[in-house]
Amino acid sequence: MEYSYAAYVPALKALADETRLKIVDMLSCGELCACKILESFQITQPTLSYHMKILCDSEVVTGRREGSWMYYRLNPDKRQWLFDFLAEITSTKENCICFN
């Protein structure tokens, strides 16, 4: 199968950070307020905003504002898209890139 590998780079780069991976792990339990996420880290609110922007820009996470609070959750469509891609490129197959 032919892939546009560049399409996967933003999401994979977003996940290539220890703090952002922990945030994704936390969000696997469900939607969380930014204030709850912040309680789990030794970082400032602007630093959390930086990480959340990267996760949201890559569409791994979605955010919604409720009053003055931001709530975040995993994007299930992007999650499945990444799972499918990683499963495909790591599986043994006849049309493997190395045989083309």
Where are these predicted regions, by residue range?
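Short alpha-helical linear motifs
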Residues: 47-51, 90-91
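Core alpha-helical elements of the protein kinase catalytic domain
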Residues: 13, 25, 52-54, 94
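Alpha-helical residues within the helix-turn-helix
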Residues: 39, 50, 56-57
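N-terminal helix-turn-helix DNA-binding core of bacterial DNA-binding proteins
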Residues: 6-46, 66, 70-79
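Short, isolated positions within intrinsically disordered regulatory regions of eukaryotic proteins
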Residues: 54, 73-75, 85
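Functionally engaged cysteine thiol sites
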Residues: 29, 33-36, 58, 91, ...
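Amphipathic alpha-helical dimerization/coiled-coil segments
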Residues: 1-7, 77-100
